[in-house]
Amino acid sequence: MPKPGILKSKSMFCVIYRSSKRDQTYLYVEKKDDFSRVPEELMKGFGQPQLAMILPLDGRKKLVNADIEKVKQALTEQGYYLQLPPPPEDLLKQHLSVMGQKTDDINK
C-alpha cells in the first residue's frame, strides 16, 4: 500500500487497431476508441479500425514489430503510433546476389 501523499505511478497501456484498408498496418492509441489525436487524413486512409489487442507497455522490453521506445514517445508526444508493414523482400535481388557469389566461387 502506498504511503499517504505518494501517488502510485500511472501504468502505460496502448490499444492496437488493425487497418481495414491496409494489410499489416496497425494504429496504436492511448485509450480504447479514442482517435481524437489522430489526424483525419490518416484515419481516412486507415479505414475502420479493428481492435487487435490492449497491451501494457510498463515492464515490457520490446514489441514484435515496433521499437517500444518509439511507440512510447509517439503516444506521449502525438497520441498515436502508426506501424507500417515491413518492406517487401526483393527476391530477384537476393537471387542475383546468390548467383553472383556462386559465379565468383566458380571463377576462383
Swiss-Prot record:
Q: Which residues form the YcgL domain?
A: 12-96
Name the Pfam families on file: YcgL
Coiled coil ranges = none
Q: List the InterPro entries hit by this protein, alphabetically.
A: YcgL-like_sf (IPR038068), YcgL_dom (IPR027354)
Q: What's the superkingdom here? A: Bacteria
Q: Which HAMAP family match?
A: UPF0745 (MF_01866)
Q: What is this protein called?
A: Protein YcgL
